[in-house]
Amino acid sequence: MSSRYSPYRIRNVGERRRVQERLLSEFNSRPVTAVAAVCAVCLETYCVQSNNIIDFLMPSECTHLFCYKCVLNMYKNAMNVPRAAVSCPMCNKKVGTWQAFFPNSVVSCKFIKKTGDRTPACLQFMLALKTIQDRYMATEEEAETEPSFVIKNLQAQLDAAQKEARDLQESMERQKQAHNVAWNSSCEQVTALQTTLADMQAQLDRSEALSSTLAEHNRAANVQIDSLRRAVQRLEAAQSAPVSVNVEFNDNARQNTNLHERFRSYVYSTVSDMMIEDSIKSLQSHVFGAACLPCSVNVEINFPFDE
């Protein structure tokens, strides 16, 4: 027997109940499966899970299944007829109580007629419409396979990818700007360092040139100092010992006796003061000048340490 049960072939009520109990026990022992039930009035098929509440009612007097919508319509039609009882539309048996099927249990329920204000027709229509919409609403698995759902999902993924691409582009732009700023700063620093290095190199060259000049001056000064030291030594030695000076003139020097006497006095005074032979020659040039004839002067200086 399929999961879709139709008890219309069985005429005996007791046998129908036994079949129903057996089916319920089989349903309870079986794993959770999808069950398709058909309303006996509207013939609409409803898919439910075997472990969930079944949205069907069955009269206690028979085994016909009715959906809630059809049961409510039965009571609504009976409300307009005084002292009318609700009967099964299939077997015309009066219905006193109804059985609702819950997981592993069967609950009996009874509808009580109230004399209060009736629900407006517009509200009833809206409630019935909402019930039908909820009942026929696509399941999550069916919605995932619909083209509109797939398109929305792809569109959402595309929007997310575009947003990520924009964020990445903005991040790259910021990094590029930061890199350009750092590069420009580095170039300026390198230029400044090169300028400073060139200035330092020029200063170093000037320092080297000045050092070489100072070294030459030092060498010249050292030479002069050595010569002066030797002269001082000679002067000190000359001052500590007597000096004999002999001056001889040739025949040309006798032409002017006054000049020779004057020159001789200068020679003695200079030799006694400076003890330098070059000074004697400069004095000769100063005294005689260019007017006199050249003459030779022999100056012999005897020091005690030359012996």
Curated annotation (Swiss-Prot):
It comes from the Viruses. Signal peptide: none annotated. The keyword Zinc-finger applies. SMART domains: RING (SM00184). The keyword Chaperone does not apply. GO terms for molecular function: DNA binding; zinc ion binding. SUPFAM superfamilies: RING/U-box. Keywords: DNA-binding, Early protein, Metal-binding, Zinc, Zinc-finger. Coiled coil: none annotated. A zinc finger (RING-type) spans 39-92. Transmembrane segments: none annotated. This is Major immediate early protein.
